Curated annotation (Swiss-Prot):
Organism: Rattus norvegicus (Rat)
Enzyme Commission (EC) number: 3.4.21.-
Alphabetic keyword roster: Disulfide bond, Glycoprotein, Hydrolase, Protease, Serine protease, Signal, Zymogen
GO molecular function: serine-type endopeptidase activity
Signal peptide range in chain numbering: 1-18
Tissues of expression: Duodenum, lung and spleen.
Glycosylated residues (UniProt): 152, 180
Lineage of origin: Eukaryota, Metazoa, Chordata, Craniata, Vertebrata
Role, per record: This enzyme is necessary for target cell lysis in cell-mediated immune responses.
Active-site annotation: 65 (charge relay system), 108 (charge relay system), 201 (charge relay system)
Name this polypeptide is given: Granzyme-like protein 2
Propeptide: 19-20
Amino acid sequence: MFLFLIFLVAVLPVNTEGGEIVWGTESKPHSRPYMASLMFYYGNSYRHYCGGFLVAKDIVMTAAHCNESNIKVILGAHNIKKRENTQVFSVVKAKPHENYDSHSLFNDIMLLKLERKAQLNGVVKTIALPRSQDWVKPGQVCTVAGWGRLANCTLSNTLQEVNLEVQKGQKCQGMSEDYNDSIQLCVGNPSEGKATGKGDSGGPFVCDGVAQGIVSRRLCTGTLPRVFTRISTFIPWIQKTMKLLQQP
């Protein structure tokens, strides 16, 4: 299905990460075929407001704070202002974590059931999830991708990506009481200045081809590191919830 996508910035709460890749680069077109653009209807058009990623043919994972009504999911996009051979879906069920806390953003994870199964091809693919015992270690460098603002605050129509270093949990704990290393990741080296920002929420933090984190929040405006949801902790919940979503 062809879709002409017009990107407009959505307004999100201050502490959430909603499409900004700072000091990153443009992704090779369709090199991250698991990426999803989440759009919701605002005014008289659909607007990109969060990222997500395909974990099964009809299931997209994202952040719980990205929950909106009338979500459209776009798969197979690179330039969201050009006509591309994308697949467009309505969401029939949204399942945020039942213990999601909108203040601390603890348990900031959600699964979306699509209206039909995606057709997997060269530009639309699923991404692997970690095992429950897999923990990303401080010093490891992984990648986040998203659509939106660049370092100069201009809007990008193309998918951007940036490599970010995992930090020790103490660094985030020292900046905020609302950090729990068992369910969250502390990401981004302050000395490098690379970051995620508005519009990237819900996108995957990918380490060696595995989605290890979900872009969640920043500790305070303009600061590093960022806080991501640690996916491996939620594997039992993910497995249980995917089974529930597959039921008629």
